[in-house]
Amino acid sequence: MSKFWIRFSEILTPILSWILLTAPFWASFVFPTIVVYFILVFDAYFLYKAASLGINSIRSYLKIRQTTKVNWLEKLKTDYPDYNKVKHIIFIPTYKEPLSVLERTLTFLAEQELPAKNLIIVLAGEDREKDFLLKADLLKAKFNKLFFDFLITNHVLKKDEVAGKSSNQLFAANVVKDYLEQKKLDKAFLTLTSCDADVSIHPKYFSNLTYLFLKNPNRYQRFWQGALVFYNNIWRVPLPVRVVHTIYSVMGVAELMRASSNFIYSTYTGSWVLFEKTGFWDNDVISEDWHLFFKAFFANEGSLELESIFLPLYADATEGQNYWSSLLAQYQQNRRWAWGVTDISYALSQFVKHRKNISIPNFVLRFIRALEQHLLWPVNWWIITLGASIPPLLNSELRYTTLGFYLPKLSGLILTLSTFFLICIISIDWLLRPPRPENVKKPFLILTILQYLTLPITGFIFGALPGMDAHTRLLLGKRLEYKVTEKFDGKKN
């Protein structure tokens, strides 16, 4: 594709988003009947999404309970006695994370059901962090003997690179590639996990992963994804942040049921063969996970699958030094995630390049899922919250028609039905959330239910606004810088 078409494909999604979110305003005068039906269809779509979230979260939770009850190590010993030939490389990209947070992450890895001697730790730091090597040496001294090996990489940012997780892990991958050649490890039995520095991986994750890896003959065209739940510090963060991450956590659980159209994110695993064939990560992207999935998809001519691991991965909710810095950090994190809209252009350009070798239905399924996510990110709140009120308010002629009169009533009915599935979200969150700390008073528990009353506000501040921000920046050609979300161990200055 030429530069013109690449740029056009970049701005197309933001343009469509702005057209849709402003439609209730301008279309109320130009196409009043059409905009009414558009809003009702959109509300029905939201009801479908709410129902899917509620039902799939319950189904997934039941599967998580089943998975946690299985002794996967015993199953390995019975079904695959030579399971020790599988080694798991774990990248932990870090930049200014507190020592205690990294210790927690490594402790969870050391206490896996699968023997820790099957794990190779790669602590991937940035040269920009002055104390990284000192911190890394302390961690290696404490944990080195527990694992198969403990490697440290120190990434020096180059001029043509974008600071962030992607460029860091590409550097680490090239270092590890040389390491594997020296150690003469069998690459056919290696997996690579990208683990966010704050993520505590469930103790059964790698034993379950090993079983699934050995069981599946298509292991080299496959990613594995667990359920990311933001519960490490959920009792400590401000209420608006807690609401956002509660919804994200339940969504992470529910999405396990949609592996055929889902994407990898945050903490995920693939075979080393798959990563090497793909060329690992790119060094000039911010949102690396969906981008990597599409890159691997085209590198394998569309023969790529995602398999869910029905186990939780415990992450930190966004937290700052104080209340307001926490809210700002949450906004910046969501804006960074919304910047993944750039993946739409990347996917289109790669499809044009590889279209002769790619199954169109296979590509369309993934592409529509990505387009739905990013196209509607800035739009959802406006249509759902204000959409039904605006056309009759702006167009007096529409107001006195039957269609205009019933629009707010029908829309309200559909959205009321949607709130029924909020019960599912509250229930699954309650079942998965860690026990209440002693320093959290019981009356605080009431807020865990009342907090959902703030959804219209939090949805705008942490959903619509960062989405509009990211889309507008892309539309105007203003690139986004990677801002690392701060991590805390509960001790703040």
Predicted regions and their residues:
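C-terminal catalytic/acceptor-binding lobe
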Residues: F297-I383, G387-T401, G459
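Hydrophobic alpha-helical transmembrane segments and immediately flanking/interface helices
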Residues: T107-I121, S396-G404, L474-N493
